[in-house]
Amino acid sequence: MLPSIAFVLTLAASAVAAPTTLAPRAGRTSPPSGCLAVGGSGKYKTVQSAVDALSASSTAAQCIFIAKGTYKEQVYIKPLKSALTVYGETTDTSSYTGNTVTITQGKSQDDAPNNDETATLRAWTPNLKVYNINLVNTRGQGSQALALSAYADKQGYYGCQFKGYQDTILAQQGSQVYAKSYIEGATDFIFGQKAIAWFDGCSLGVLTASVGYITANGRDSDSNPSYYVINNSKIAAAPGNTVSAGAYYLGRPWRNFSRVVFQKTSMTNVINAAGWKVWNTDDPRTDKVTYAEYANTGDGSKGTRASFSKKLSAALSPSTVLGSDYKSWVDAAYLS
């Protein structure tokens, strides 16, 4: 973690608006009407080439459909004036388990100037929905290496997978939702400074490590809106990984006003009894944190929690965290 945080055809204004909501458990094996098509028999061979063909000036909704396959590239979605939906081919939209589209690369901060530029997907446009895509950073242990850099408001990721080791997801700005998705990592693998992020029905897979941290929220003042809520999710060792009991913490404070809640979440014994950890011994950063839990279950939810954490008397709601208008941009069919 460094202090600096330094995806068919372009739709015309008269084109049919891209669909933005699909019923869970429906298949999606061909491009929705009006979408740019990547891979298979589509016009575009890379995801980035389809992204580059999007209109930067149109306000009509746009979409991209990606055929099954592995795409070895880094993708940057610049700010658009329209809503954008990116679909991955799948026979089951309700889950990440049947995903057939993977975007993967291995940049890290060893060869990029900041966290954002290491990400497999650099998502800088607001009003973005991403469905059933696996985002992977293969760098592994040793450096910051992101699968996703989410840098804009009203972004939703549904039935996706995010895999990395350190700093897997940068939830940096705006309001964001991650639902029915899989997130994997070891060190600070959900982190950022200003975003309000709601994680719903997600599986968090932790990798083999002597010690690990799921979140590292960098909220730096009482006026900073940042808030991470992990709701109705599961925490366990990632498939194929052996993780010692108590090796992982729910989070540590990147900044003093760090704010994270885990609620109604199943935790295996990989979670330490203390739950939460100081940033480091000489610089704890716990004086203004909000670290809380409600109705969690499993062996990892038991024990004496850190003195700077608390228990809530009721669960937080999406409207409380994301705002009363959240259903205007969130695909609520994916929420618990």
What are these regions (language model features)?
Residues 19-336:
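Sequence-level preference for short, compositionally simple segments enriched
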Residues 1-26:
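Fungal secretory targeting signals
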